Amino acid sequence: MEINFKYTDNILKVRSWIEELATKKVIACDFEVASFWSDKEKASYAKKLEDSINDEYKLYYRQIIATDGLSHPALTKLTHLSIAWSANDAYVFILANDNITNALLDFLVDTDVLELWHNACFDLKHIYYHTDKFPKHFVDTQLLAKCYLNDASNALCDTSLKALMRDTYGDWAIAKDNFNQNNQYDEKMLEYSATDACATYALFRQMCRQHRQILDYLKNIS
């Protein structure tokens, strides 16, 4: 499926898009996250590690070098937020400064729009870390998918977004090394981010249709 998306790092456009998104009933959201330290800074700490004779400093340097987008929110930087309102339409916000990041975080915790997150534990820990709040209304599509698949075998119960939506969107995964601050404006990263949000929206719609079919079936046999 072809994805239509726009991106911005302009605070005025961010505010305009937020106003538009606030009129939707349902949106699908996804953060991209990178280490707080750039590759250049990590290289500098790697050099310090080689030269250091202090064990405490060595431990500190190793911790910095090992950080990535999956690390604790205190050790990471939010780089993108993608928000989709259909299976193929999305905005990608490049979180280039605190003004943009804070405006979007405020929207996420204040809006009454239903938010869809795939593996919400990952994204919501960042929202809570920065705001001390959670979104008012949200659905974790990964947990929902797990309930539908309901199989003890992990091989038959893969609820990763890429596995669930590969037939619709193809293989859009990118290498782990791409999740860094240097790639905030990379076209592949922007498309990846947009696809994540659109795929989450499409997955939710598919499960809603299946849920209605189940309810209709139960009504017919009752």
Which ranges hold each PLM region?
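Conserved RNase H-like, two-metal-ion catalytic cores of nucleic-acid enzymes
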Residues: M1-A163, D167
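Secondary-structure transition/capping residues
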Residues: E115, A175-K176, H211
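Generic helix-packing signal
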Residues: L149, Y169, Y201-F204
